[in-house]
Amino acid sequence: MKEKYGYGGWINLDHHKTGCARMMKDEHFFREVESNCWDPGVRMNECDDHGVDVQVLSTVPVMFNYWAKPDDALDISKILNNHIAAIVVEFPKQFTGLGTIPLQEPEKAIMELQRCIHELDLVGVQIGSNVNGTNLSDESLFSVFEAAADLGAAIFIHPWDIMGKEEMEKYWLPWLVGMPAETSRAICSMIFGGVFERLPNLRVAFAHGGGSFPATAGRIQQGYDVRPDLCAIDNQVNPKNYLGKFWVDSLVHDGDALDFLIKKIGADKIALGSDYPFPLGELEPGKLIESMDYPDEQKDKLLFQNAMDWLGLPSNYFS
């Protein structure tokens, strides 16, 4: 990539042995990955082993490339999106896909979003929780959300570029503490920024059970009540009104947390999440949901139907 674009910072795979690769950022090691990150055959075998019928494919967030020159980010987005779309075309009963778009330049992001929906037949896009430090409430990004709503495209928001990560490198804290906070940052930005208010038909899902947002929703509400001069400057609607207006995934790792999430967000707005194939995911997707004492109808929603509603697909789409 450095040779192609003339500067560094890109993620490359170093296939140092069969079935394994190092994700490298220039000469710096980022993480080790296995062939289930790039080989659809391996993915389908592992899905069969764990009872997963359909996966929604998306780009690894570190490859959003919002830091890059916009034209280059658009180019690499096209490469990534074409790859995902090709897998979906080859295996339409096993996969659907989300694209990635160069949000550092909204006009180019909208162009690629339109291509994802109209030409590649993807169902939406995955984006980060911020864009080079800019919150998702920023007016420059509203046109992207507006285009997604008009296109009927689903949006999945995953934490990335974690705030404060340099100050908490030890103990894996960026993943354990920073990511939940980043997700809450994204939700609050879209609530207080009026994105959901202005675009009521926008279908957005947030990763990792909405991060720290559900547990701090009361604190956020209190902030709105006591300091509207700080919280309600762009949207005067009570933040609690938006509970149940967006989706979160089910990846909370704990039965009590899942019960709370259902109570706070709603049983119709929680979709099965796996974080596959990474270590903070659920190795056997749906195992927690299946273990809970919920009615079968509710389990069906959590395991399947809610995701289809968020994606905007009919229930029999993969039949």
Regions of interest found by a model, annotated:
Residues 1-319:
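Helix-coil boundary/capping segments in enzymes
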